[in-house]
Amino acid sequence: MAGTSRIFFLSNLFSISLRSILPRERSIYLKNTHAQVEYAMRAVRQGSACVGIRSDKYVVLASVKRSASELASYQEKLFRVDDHVGIAITGLVADARVLTKYMQTECLNHKYTYESQMIVGRLVENVADKHQKCTQSYVRRPYGVGLLVAGCDKTGPHLYETSPSGCYYEYKAMALGARSNSAKTYLQREFEKRGDDGFSKLTEQELVFHAVRSLKGCLAGDKKLNAQCVSVAVVGVDKSFEHLSDEEVSDVIKEAIGDDEDDTKDNEEEDEDEDDDDV
């Protein structure tokens, strides 16, 4: 009985912070339940979508922002870590703030000690280790947030993804969050169109265009992209991490979505012509 009581005590410690996304307050020690890291990864899948694309010179991050109600402001999903690094987040924003501060501190400590910018891959590895430690301790639950880390160091531009499990991967293009499969499909199709080069030869403007356009299918219902609900940021070999202004984002949306609407109209006209020919 004492052992059973201890198990239930530990289960409460595990589940209390993720109560909003857990079906019931149980832990990995109880039968017919899932590991807490699975619930953390579910939070990532339910978060608003974010996209990252990398070329030989630049990395672009774009994210869909959500508001709790019509009277609430939109939550920012892109954060600057250092001059050469920034992140896009999906999942629990409170957890993302903790990891952002940790990454900022790591970069500052490295700059103070070595008088140079921190290698992006090393920073990502440190964050992944922080993720992984939470999967082995009952005192703290896993971070319910996924990160797209964009950075540029002496080895060139980089785009990484980290997950609550502690795994991390480097990508040429990646999308996370709710309905992100639509963005992944678009990015994969555009990547394959360009053959072996992929996105490597694209300019900054072209990367921004494709990042924004890929987000079109990530919105719920009949919602449309606008400058209020979309954030875009760029970092590159000769460019510090910088957010695009609302005016710049609005212009890109008009260009990207406008072209898409024109293509749709052309396709509809072609279908009508084919119907006339059949008659």
Annotate each language-model stretch with its function:
Residues 1-279:
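Long, low-complexity N-terminal extensions
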